[in-house]
Protein backbone atom coordinates (compact mmCIF):
# COMPACT_ATOMS: atom_id res chain seq x y z
CA UNK A 1 0.00 0.00 0.00
CA UNK A 2 2.82 2.49 0.64
CA UNK A 3 5.07 1.59 -2.29
CA UNK A 4 3.34 3.40 -5.15
CA UNK A 5 1.97 0.20 -6.67
CA UNK A 6 -1.56 -1.17 -6.94
CA UNK A 7 -2.53 -4.81 -6.54
CA UNK A 8 -5.88 -6.42 -7.26
CA UNK A 9 -6.96 -10.03 -6.78
CA UNK A 10 -9.55 -10.66 -9.48
CA UNK A 11 -12.48 -12.96 -8.83
CA UNK A 12 -12.08 -16.66 -9.61
CA UNK A 13 -12.41 -17.39 -13.30
CA UNK A 14 -11.78 -13.79 -14.39
CA UNK A 15 -8.33 -14.41 -15.91
CA UNK A 16 -7.53 -17.73 -17.58
CA UNK A 17 -4.63 -19.73 -16.16
CA UNK A 18 -4.02 -21.94 -19.18
CA UNK A 19 -5.53 -25.17 -20.38
CA UNK A 20 -3.53 -27.36 -17.97
CA UNK A 21 -4.02 -25.31 -14.80
CA UNK A 22 -7.58 -25.06 -13.54
CA UNK A 23 -6.93 -22.90 -10.50
CA UNK A 24 -4.12 -21.92 -8.20
CA UNK A 25 -3.94 -23.25 -4.65
CA UNK A 26 -7.43 -24.72 -4.80
CA UNK A 27 -8.92 -21.40 -5.88
CA UNK A 28 -7.13 -19.27 -3.29
CA UNK A 29 -4.86 -17.60 -5.82
CA UNK A 30 -5.55 -15.91 -9.12
CA UNK A 31 -3.45 -14.33 -11.83
CA UNK A 32 -3.18 -10.60 -12.48
CA UNK A 33 -0.58 -7.83 -12.57
CA UNK A 34 0.82 -5.37 -10.08
CA UNK A 35 0.44 -1.95 -11.67
CA UNK A 36 1.22 1.69 -10.98
CA UNK A 37 -2.44 2.73 -10.92
CA UNK A 38 -6.01 1.47 -10.70
CA UNK A 39 -6.44 2.66 -14.31
CA UNK A 40 -3.53 0.48 -15.47
CA UNK A 41 -4.99 -2.48 -13.59
CA UNK A 42 -8.35 -1.97 -15.30
CA UNK A 43 -6.64 -1.86 -18.68
CA UNK A 44 -4.78 -5.11 -17.96
CA UNK A 45 -8.09 -6.73 -16.97
CA UNK A 46 -9.61 -5.55 -20.25
CA UNK A 47 -6.79 -7.31 -22.10
CA UNK A 48 -6.59 -10.48 -20.02
CA UNK A 49 -10.08 -11.54 -18.91
CA UNK A 50 -12.26 -13.98 -20.76
CA UNK A 51 -13.31 -17.51 -21.42
CA UNK A 52 -10.93 -20.40 -21.79
CA UNK A 53 -11.61 -23.91 -23.03
CA UNK A 54 -11.44 -26.40 -20.19
CA UNK A 55 -11.93 -23.93 -17.35
CA UNK A 56 -14.20 -25.32 -14.63
CA UNK A 57 -15.97 -21.93 -14.38
CA UNK A 58 -15.65 -18.37 -15.52
CA UNK A 59 -16.58 -14.98 -14.20
CA UNK A 60 -19.47 -13.13 -15.80
CA UNK A 61 -18.36 -10.62 -18.43
CA UNK A 62 -18.52 -7.00 -17.29
CA UNK A 63 -21.26 -4.78 -18.72
CA UNK A 64 -18.59 -2.41 -20.11
CA UNK A 65 -14.81 -2.41 -20.25
CA UNK A 66 -13.14 -2.25 -16.84
CA UNK A 67 -11.57 1.03 -17.93
CA UNK A 68 -15.04 2.48 -18.63
CA UNK A 69 -16.44 1.08 -15.38
CA UNK A 70 -13.85 3.09 -13.45
CA UNK A 71 -15.63 6.32 -14.37
CA UNK A 72 -19.11 5.33 -13.22
CA UNK A 73 -20.56 6.45 -9.92
CA UNK A 74 -20.57 3.39 -7.66
CA UNK A 75 -23.65 4.63 -5.82
CA UNK A 76 -23.95 4.16 -2.09
CA UNK A 77 -21.81 1.22 -1.07
CA UNK A 78 -22.17 -0.86 2.07
CA UNK A 79 -18.68 -1.15 3.59
CA UNK A 80 -17.64 -3.09 6.67
CA UNK A 81 -14.24 -3.09 8.33
CA UNK A 82 -12.55 -4.86 11.22
CA UNK A 83 -9.77 -3.39 13.35
CA UNK A 84 -9.07 -6.32 15.65
CA UNK A 85 -6.71 -8.76 13.92
CA UNK A 86 -7.74 -12.42 14.11
CA UNK A 87 -4.27 -13.46 15.28
CA UNK A 88 -4.49 -11.52 18.56
CA UNK A 89 -1.96 -8.88 17.54
CA UNK A 90 -2.75 -5.23 18.09
CA UNK A 91 -2.81 -2.64 15.35
CA UNK A 92 -0.24 0.10 15.39
CA UNK A 93 -2.01 3.27 16.68
CA UNK A 94 -1.11 5.15 13.48
CA UNK A 95 -2.62 2.40 11.31
CA UNK A 96 -5.76 2.30 13.47
CA UNK A 97 -6.09 6.08 13.16
CA UNK A 98 -5.79 5.93 9.36
CA UNK A 99 -8.35 3.10 9.13
CA UNK A 100 -10.83 5.06 11.26
CA UNK A 101 -10.17 8.25 9.28
CA UNK A 102 -10.77 6.37 6.03
CA UNK A 103 -14.05 4.99 7.41
CA UNK A 104 -15.16 8.53 8.32
CA UNK A 105 -14.29 9.83 4.84
CA UNK A 106 -16.24 7.00 3.20
CA UNK A 107 -19.24 7.63 5.47
CA UNK A 108 -19.12 11.38 4.74
CA UNK A 109 -19.41 10.65 1.01
CA UNK A 110 -22.69 8.78 1.51
CA UNK A 111 -21.56 5.19 1.93
CA UNK A 112 -22.90 3.01 4.73
CA UNK A 113 -19.87 2.16 6.85
CA UNK A 114 -19.94 -0.25 9.76
CA UNK A 115 -17.22 -1.49 12.07
CA UNK A 116 -17.63 -5.19 12.77
CA UNK A 117 -16.35 -7.28 15.63
CA UNK A 118 -14.08 -10.07 14.58
CA UNK A 119 -15.74 -13.45 15.20
CA UNK A 120 -13.20 -15.29 13.11
CA UNK A 121 -11.65 -18.43 14.60
CA UNK A 122 -8.00 -18.52 13.46
CA UNK A 123 -7.59 -22.19 14.39
CA UNK A 124 -10.50 -23.25 12.18
CA UNK A 125 -9.09 -21.20 9.31
CA UNK A 126 -5.58 -22.52 9.82
CA UNK A 127 -6.80 -26.12 9.84
CA UNK A 128 -9.07 -25.81 6.80
CA UNK A 129 -6.64 -23.66 4.81
CA UNK A 130 -3.79 -25.99 5.73
CA UNK A 131 -5.71 -29.01 4.47
CA UNK A 132 -6.59 -27.23 1.23
CA UNK A 133 -3.11 -25.86 0.58
CA UNK A 134 -1.28 -29.06 1.53
CA UNK A 135 -3.64 -31.14 -0.63
CA UNK A 136 -3.08 -28.80 -3.56
CA UNK A 137 0.71 -28.94 -3.15
CA UNK A 138 0.54 -32.73 -3.02
CA UNK A 139 -1.59 -32.96 -6.16
CA UNK A 140 0.64 -30.49 -8.01
CA UNK A 141 3.85 -32.33 -7.15
CA UNK A 142 2.33 -35.74 -7.92
CA UNK A 143 1.33 -34.39 -11.33
CA UNK A 144 4.88 -33.14 -11.85
CA UNK A 145 6.23 -36.58 -10.91
CA UNK A 146 3.92 -38.19 -13.46
CA UNK A 147 4.94 -35.71 -16.17
CA UNK A 148 8.68 -36.12 -15.59
CA UNK A 149 8.69 -39.79 -14.66
CA UNK A 150 10.93 -38.93 -11.69
CA UNK A 151 10.04 -38.75 -8.00
CA UNK A 152 10.26 -35.38 -6.29
CA UNK A 153 13.01 -35.41 -3.68
CA UNK A 154 13.83 -33.16 -0.77
CA UNK A 155 16.56 -31.58 -2.91
CA UNK A 156 14.05 -30.48 -5.58
CA UNK A 157 11.91 -28.16 -3.46
CA UNK A 158 12.11 -25.79 -0.50
CA UNK A 159 11.90 -27.34 2.97
CA UNK A 160 8.37 -26.07 3.67
CA UNK A 161 7.17 -27.43 0.32
CA UNK A 162 8.79 -30.79 1.05
CA UNK A 163 7.17 -30.94 4.50
CA UNK A 164 3.79 -30.05 3.00
CA UNK A 165 4.27 -32.68 0.28
CA UNK A 166 4.96 -35.32 2.92
CA UNK A 167 1.91 -34.19 4.94
CA UNK A 168 -0.27 -34.40 1.82
CA UNK A 169 0.31 -38.15 1.73
CA UNK A 170 -1.54 -38.71 5.01
CA UNK A 171 -4.50 -36.32 4.66
CA UNK A 172 -7.42 -35.99 2.29
CA UNK A 173 -8.36 -32.74 0.64
CA UNK A 174 -11.76 -34.16 -0.34
Could you tell me what each predicted segment is?
Residues 15, 21, 118-119, 157:
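Proline- and acidic/polar-enriched loop/turn elements at helix boundaries
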Residues 2, 6-102, 143, 147-151:
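A short helix-breaking turn/cap at a secondary-structure junction
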